[in-house]
Design a protein with these regions (language model features):
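Conserved class I S-adenosyl-L-methionine
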Residues: 54, 85-94
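Conserved SAM-binding strand-loop segment of SAM-dependent methyltransferases
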Residues: 132-143
Length: 226
């Protein structure tokens, strides 16, 4: 399957699995591409416009020129470079977001999708398998007991930053890309003080700078660098 056909297949797969195991609300399943898929790809947009160094590490050089997924003119079946060997942990993946859309866009990056709730991991695993995503592994585990470490961590609003950071202590080498909404000034200040994060190590990027729909008005990508 090409990238585009995989994205097209996602809605049907999630509707099917959601009828068996409710992991997405009715409102969100009716707006799956905007509320889940495109929101997940906000991380890829951030890399494209603010962190091309990481985008290249993930093998996404061709996304710098455009990609139909983002409504640009260039369709790439595999937006990857040579020798990509990055590992990414999606912690608290739920039914597979942001991990599955990102794994679709970056097929040579190894994604580990982890959640403590077994039924959510089942949905993520079955959807990834149906899409033929060979770069996805799913794990039913709490973060604290997950073995190993990863180059990057991604996650979507599973908790406040001051609670999230202890979960991933010792589990990442380069960056955390965290999708979160609302006014984040106090939350970030609390986390920076509590964990003595260096000044300049935390950045915030509004997805609405590229995606202008009202849904993204207060949606941000938080980048925490080592």
């Amino acid at each position: 399957e090409t990238q585009l056909s995989r994205f097209e297949d996602m809605e049907g797969l999630y509707r099917e699995w959601n009828s068996k195991i409710n992991v997405v609300s009715r409102k969100d399943i009716d707006n799956l591409y905007e509320h889940h898929v495109l929101h997940s790809l906000g991380i890829a947009l951030y890399l494209k416009f603010r962190r091309p160094d990481v985008l290249r590490m993930w093998g996404g050089e061709s996304l710098l020129g455009g990609c139909e997924v983002f409504g640009d003119e260039t369709l790439t079946e595999n937006a990857v470079g040579d020798g990509v060997s990055c590992t990414v942990l999606d912690l608290g993946c739920g039914g597979g977001f942001p991990g599955i859309p990102l794994a679709t866009l970056f097929p040579e990056v190894k994604f580990t999708l982890c959640d403590s709730i077994g039924k959510k991991v089942t949905v993520a695993r079955e959807v990834a398998a149906a899409l033929g995503l060979e770069n996805v592994e799913t794990v039913n585990s709490r973060a604290e007991t997950l073995p190993g470490a990863f180059d990057y961590v991604v996650s979507r609003a599973v908790t406040s930053l001051d609670k999230f950071l202890p979960w991933v202590k010792g589990k990442w080498h380069r960056d955390i890309f965290y999708l979160k909404g609302g006014d984040l000034v106090e939350e970030i200040a609390l986390a920076m003080g509590k964990f003595r994060l260096p000044k300049g190590s935390v950045g915030v990027w509004p997805i609405s700078s590229v995606l202008h729909d009202e849904f993204f008005a207060e949606k941000m990508v938080i980048d925490i660098r080592k």
